Swiss-Prot record:
Gene: DUS2
Keyword Endoplasmic reticulum on entry: yes
EC number: 1.3.1.91
Pfam families named among the record's database cross-references: dsrm (PF00035), Dus (PF01207)
Biased composition, class Polar residues, residue ranges: 330-342
Phenotype upon changing residue 417 to A: Mildly decreased affinity for tRNA
Compartments, as annotated in UniProt: Cytoplasm; Endoplasmic reticulum
Protein origin, superkingdom: Eukaryota
Protein name as catalogued: tRNA-dihydrouridine(20) synthase [NAD(P)+]-like
Species the sequence originates in: Homo sapiens (Human)
Means of activity regulation: Inhibited by canertinib, PD 168393, AST-1306 and PF-6274484.
PROSITE patterns per UniProt: UPF0034
Length: 493
């Protein structure tokens, strides 16, 4: 058995709840700024996490857990290391332990989601589906408690009867977990249903471990003082806040809520500093604006198709330029240092225009790439076709490409995992140095529209179409009025 070290205290704490799409690094840091004691990341599925590699990101000063497709699944930093709890979705004890061991050196605690009622969680036997399988719950939690260095917790919903609920939580307590978070609603209930404070209180009276009360955002928590009132009503050790914190993270501030625009600007700064993908940034800002989405500010946010445009919508254009330039410069310095350490032969690159850029497929429409934009521009200007020269570095098998256009060479200082990606990066350098659009979402060249229309038809409901539609859809319907009978993306959190 591995003894848990650096135990996180769950007594008398204000906690940011795990929330899908919301609990990424910028929101967690913002909640800490405003007074949260502990912050949970969004639920991350074990099957996805066990494919990830741990990468130290020296540019951002973060630790990233990166999927095989190079997407960052989980990002954390030193500032939250002793206060962030990693929540996983799992239905298998061994997978859960593998994930816990992967992240345990970078987080303060490990939590298992046993309360999410959404189909994407329950269909895999995760989330609230676990509530009907106490044996599996016991195996998962016992395995984690014995096998990881961090305190283990779980988050549940209440069962149809108080007797069954108390029986379950007593069995959970015997696994040796450090605390239990209780969402005071049944699996089938939604935010418009009242939270059962009396059931949480009965659980708190029954257990000796800390009980964390959750589910009071709509009925109970409108301001800071309400958090303590909710804690007393449930007799809980601590309170976990979800929606109220999503709407305005300064709910944790003892001095009272800060103006929303101030909060949003602070959130955006973190999002830029930590390279948060703009679709996630946009989603979180939409949750904060809520009824104000039809305001001038809301319309600007709705139209934004990049982090730069989001910053400009909130008067942070200069901050974006300054920050991204600093990050690019840091990346260039690190790349140069890496080249020296790998012992690459020095080559004459005088006259080569260089930038630290990478090609991110998610930032471009399905039928448009920087290489296509560059080729189209060369044809329009009656220039020879771009010529790409690509080399592979033997040590790590990464690629770098130089593109020649009108006798001028362009190159990204960042090495890529494939020849195609390296060529796209070189094309971006050329386009940016010429002040030309590179085809990103929201800045497509009109001359390419015909080519897009002539491309083979794609399934309008396919995964890529849904991905591209997502940001706008999220802003059009960022939340559901409680009592409407409809479900919000955040149900169960």
């Amino acid at each position: 058995m591995i003894l848990n070290s650096l135990s996180l205290c769950y007594h008398n704490k204000l906690i940011l709840a795990p929330m899908v799409r919301v609990g990424t690094l910028p929101m967690r840091l913002l909640a800490l700024d405003y007074g949260a004691d502990i912050v949970y990341c969004e639920e991350l599925i074990d099957l996805k996490m066990i494919q990830c590699k741990r990468v130290v990101n020296e540019v951002l000063s973060t630790v990233d857990f990166v999927a095989p497709d190079d997407r960052v699944v989980f990002r954390t930093c030193e500032r939250e290391q002793n206060r962030v709890v990693f929540q996983m979705g799992t239905s298998d004890a061994e997978r859960a332990l593998a994930v816990a061991r992967l992240v345990e050196n970078d987080v303060a605690g490990i939590d298992v989601n046993m309360g999410c009622p959404k189909q994407y969680s329950t269909k895999g036997g995760m989330g609230a589906a676990l509530l009907s399988d106490p044996d599996k719950i016991e195996k998962i939690l016992s395995t984690l408690v014995k096998g990881t260095r961090r305190p283990v917790t779980c988050k549940i919903r209440i069962l149809p009867s108080l007797e069954d609920t108390l029986s379950l939580v007593k069995r959970i307590e015997r696994t040796g977990i450090a605390a239990i978070a209780v969402h005071g609603r049944k699996r089938e209930e939604r935010p418009q249903h009242p939270v059962s404070c009396e059931v949480i209180k009965a659980i708190a009276d029954t257990l000796s471990i800390p009980v964390i009360a959750n589910g009071g955002s709509h009925d109970h928590i409108q301001q800071y003082s309400d958090i303590e009132d909710f804690r007393q009503a449930t007799a809980a050790s601590s309170v976990m806040v979800a929606r109220a914190a999503m709407w305005n993270p300064s709910i944790f501030l003892k001095e009272g809520l800060r103006p929303l625009e101030e909060v949003m600007q602070k959130y955006i700064r973190y999002a830029v500093q930590y390279d948060n993908h703009y679709t996630n940034t946009k989603y979180c800002l939409c949750q904060m604006l809520r009824e104000q989405l039809e305001s001038p500010q809301g319309r600007l946010l709705h139209a934004a198709q990049s982090s730069r445009e989001i910053c400009e919508a909130f008067g942070l254009g200069a901050f974006y330029e300054e920050t991204t330039q600093e990050l690019d410069a840091q990346q260039a310095r690190l790349s140069a240092k890496t080249s020296e350490q790998t012992g690459e032969p020095a080559e004459d690159t005088s006259g080569v225009i260089k930038m630290a850029v990478k090609f991110d497929r998610r930032a471009y429409p399905a039928q448009i790439t920087p290489k296509m934009c560059l080729l189209e521009w060369c044809r329009r200007e009656k220039l020879a076709q771009p010529v790409y020269e690509t080399v592979q570095r033997p040590l790590d098998r990464l690629f770098s490409s130089i593109v020649t256009v009108a006798e001028q060479k362009y190159q990204s200082t960042l090495w890529d995992k494939s020849k195609k990606l390296a060529e796209q990066a070189a094309a971006i350098v050329c386009l940016r140095s010429q002040g030309l659009p590179e085809g990103r979402l929201g800045e497509e060249s009109p001359s390419l529209h015909k080519r897009k229309r002539e491309a083979p038809d794609q399934d309008p409901g396919g995964p890529r179409a849904q991905e591209l539609a997502q940001p706008g859809d999220l802003c059009k319907k960022p939340f559901v009025a409680l009592g409407s009978g409809e479900e919000s993306p955040l149900e169960g959190w």
